[in-house]
C-alpha cells in the first residue's frame, strides 16, 4: 500500500497549462476515484503517478519519496487501461504469467501467484482458454489478474469498464469493490461516470479544467457540495438550480414533495405542470414546468400523470444556496441565513 501526494504540480503542453499548482493527497489503502468530464485533467494525474506523463513542475511523492523523475518500471505500480492490452495468441495463464517471467520469478512462485489471483478474479476454470473465446468482462479480468500478480503498492485504472455493456459494468463494479476489500491496496480509478464514482469510491476527487472542485467521501460530496458545479455533476438527475436574485437556489430532485396541495411548513412551494414521466420501477422521474423553469423531480410515487397540474414543495433543510460565483452559502457562513430561506419562498404561488 502507498500514499500518493501531488505537491504544487503543474502540467503544461507547450504554453497550455492543463494543471496548475495542484496539491492533492491520495490516502494509503483507499479506493480513490478521479472523476470529471473529458479534458478535466484526471488521466493526466494518473499518467504522472505512472511516470508516463511527467509533471512540468512540482513533485509527485509515494510514501514520502519523490518519484517525479523515477523510471516507471521502478515505481511499484500496476495499470489497467480502457483497452484490455492482452495478448490474443496466449492463453489466460500465459497472459497472467507474462510479466512474472520477464521479472524472472521462479516457476513455483509463478504457479502459486497465478492460482491465487485467477481465483480472485474468477478465471480459475479458464486458464487454458484463449482471450478470443471469452467475454469482454472476462478479458478485462485477465488484465486485472496480470496487474495483481505484481503485488504493486498502487493500482492505477483508467476507465477500465467503459468498453463493457451496462449490465456487465454493474457486475464488474461490484467485483472491483470486492477485490479492493480483499487486497487492501491503494486503488486510483479514473472515470467520467459519476455513478461509478459514487458506487465505488472511498474518496472522490471531482475535477474541472485542471482544478479540484471538491475532494470528499461520496456521502459528503452528494449531501454537502461545496459549489454549484459539484451539486450538478454528482447526482442523477442533477440538482435543480434556480436563479434567486444575484444568488442561486438549489434542491435535489428526490427531495421535492409532489402533491395537489402545498406541504405544510415548506418554505418553497410552487405550482407546476408535468411535461414528461419516466417510470423506472422503484421510482418515477418527472420533468415539470414551473413558471419559466423546467425542473426534474424523482419520486417513489408513480401516480402522477403526464399533463397533470401539481404542487411542488421543498422543506427548509433540503434547500441549498449558492452565491453568484456558484460557491456554497452555508448557515455558518452568514449571519442572516434565515433570510435566504425566506427569499426561497419569495415567488411561491401555491
Predicted regions and their residues:
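Conserved ABC transporter NBD signature motif
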Residues: 58-66
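ABC ATPase nucleotide-binding domain helices that frame the ATP-binding cleft
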Residues: 43-46, 142
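Conserved structural motif at the start of ABC-family nucleotide-binding domains
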Residues: 4, 19-21
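ABC ATPase nucleotide-binding domain
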Residues: 5, 25, 61, 311-313
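Helix-to-loop junction immediately C-terminal to a conserved catalytic motif
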Residues: 50
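ABC ATPase nucleotide-binding domains
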Residues: 72-226
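Non-catalytic connector elements of ABC transporters
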Residues: 237, 248-350
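The feature captures the beta-strand-to-loop junction immediately N-terminal to the Walker
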Residues: 35-37
Amino acid at each position: 500500500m502507498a500514499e500518493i501526494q501531488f505537491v504544487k504540480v503543474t502540467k503544461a503542453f507547450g504554453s497550455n497549462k492543463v494543471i496548475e499548482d495542484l496539491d492533492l493527497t491520495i490516502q494509503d489503502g483507499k479506493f480513490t476515484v478521479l472523476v470529471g468530464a473529458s479534458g478535466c485533467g484526471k488521466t493526466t494525474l494518473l499518467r504522472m503517478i505512472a511516470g508516463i506523463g511527467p509533471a512540468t513542475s512540482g513533485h509527485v511523492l509515494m510514501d514520502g519519496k519523490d518519484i517525479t523523475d523515477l523510471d516507471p518500471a521502478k515505481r511499484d505500480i500496476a495499470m489497467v487501461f480502457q483497452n484490455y492490452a492482452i495478448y490474443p495468441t496466449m492463453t489466460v495463464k500465459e497472459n497472467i504469467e507474462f510479466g512474472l517471467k520477464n521479472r524472472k520469478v521462479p516457476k513455483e512462485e509463478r504457479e502459486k501467484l497465478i492460482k491465487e489471483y485467477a481465483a480472485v478474479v474468477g478465471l480459475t476454470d479458464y486458464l487454458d482458454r484463449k482471450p478470443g473465446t471469452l467475454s469482454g468482462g472476462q478479458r478485462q479480468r485477465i488484465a486485472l489478474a496480470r496487474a495483481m500478480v505484481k503485488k504493486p503498492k498502487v493500482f492505477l485504472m483508467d476507465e477500465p469498464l467503459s468498453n463493457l455493456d451496462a449490465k456487465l459494468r454493474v457486475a464488474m463494479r461490484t467485483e472491483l469493490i470486492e477485490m479492493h476489500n480483499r487486497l487492501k491496496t491503494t486503488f486510483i480509478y479514473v472515470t467520467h461516470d459519476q455513478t461509478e464514482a459514487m458506487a465505488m469510491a472511498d474518496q472522490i476527487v471531482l475535477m474541472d479544467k485542471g482544478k479540484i472542485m471538491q475532494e470528499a467521501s461520496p456521502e459528503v460530496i452528494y449531501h454537502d457540495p461545496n459549489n454549484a458545479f459539484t451539486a450538478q455533476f454528482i447526482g442523477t438527475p442533477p440538482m435543480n438550480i434556480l436563479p434567486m436574485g444575484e444568488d442561486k437556489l438549489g434542491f435535489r430532485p428526490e427531495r421535492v414533495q409532489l402533491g395537489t396541495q402545498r406541504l405544510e411548513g415548506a418554505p418553497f412551494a410552487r405550482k407546476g405542470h408535468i411535461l414528461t414521466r419516466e417510470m423506472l420501477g422503484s421510482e418515477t422521474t418527472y420533468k415539470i414546468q414551473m413558471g419559466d423553469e423546467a425542473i426534474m423531480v424523482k419520486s417513489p410515487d408513480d401516480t402522477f400523470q403526464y399533463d397533470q397540474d401539481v404542487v411542488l414543495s421543498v422543506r427548509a433543510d433540503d434547500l441549498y444556496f449558492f452565491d453568484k460565483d456558484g460557491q456554497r452559502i452555508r448557515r455558518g457562513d452568514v449571519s442572516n441565513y434565515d433570510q435566504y430561506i425566506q427569499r426561497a419562498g419569495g415567488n411561491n404561488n401555491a
